């Protein structure tokens, strides 16, 4: 409701910055978890991260995890560093609490099957089909099954 009018939207933005202030990190994104785990994926160079600033995303820390999120309407998790089985419940509990304080009712994470983050989320939450990815191979030496994505690699993030 607050996001529907200009006056209240400004108040909500100030409130959300207050809620997120202690969690925010001065970064434009996080390293690609898929490439870190040995897959091929989007190179998150400084130029790429600068390009991604067109969208209101932020990097936050909850417990030991660093999470790249977009909280425009829902919370979209773009990618995560240091999300492990040992800290996952604590991280998700903290993220759910943050969503509650922001009045957000949905948290989404999208990634390619077969990655460690996919396996971690699939252990705790039901999976559902998401965005299809199609490839046209123009002679790349990288097999398509080795290419993986997370939500932050998509332009809508």
Show where each model-derived region lies.
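Amide-forming acyltransferase catalytic core, primarily the GNAT-like/NAT-type
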Residues: 1-74
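Acyl-donor binding region in acyl/amide transferases
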Residues: 72-130
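C-terminal functional modules
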Residues: 108, 116-157
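Soluble, non-transmembrane catalytic domains of enzymes that act on hydrophobic metabolites at membranes
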Residues: 23-42, 51, 58, 79-80, ...
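Compositionally biased, low-structure terminal segments
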Residues: 3, 9, 89, 139, ...
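Generic structural motif recognizing short loop/turn segments at the entrances and edges of beta-strands
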Residues: 44-45, 56-58, 63-65, 72-76, ...
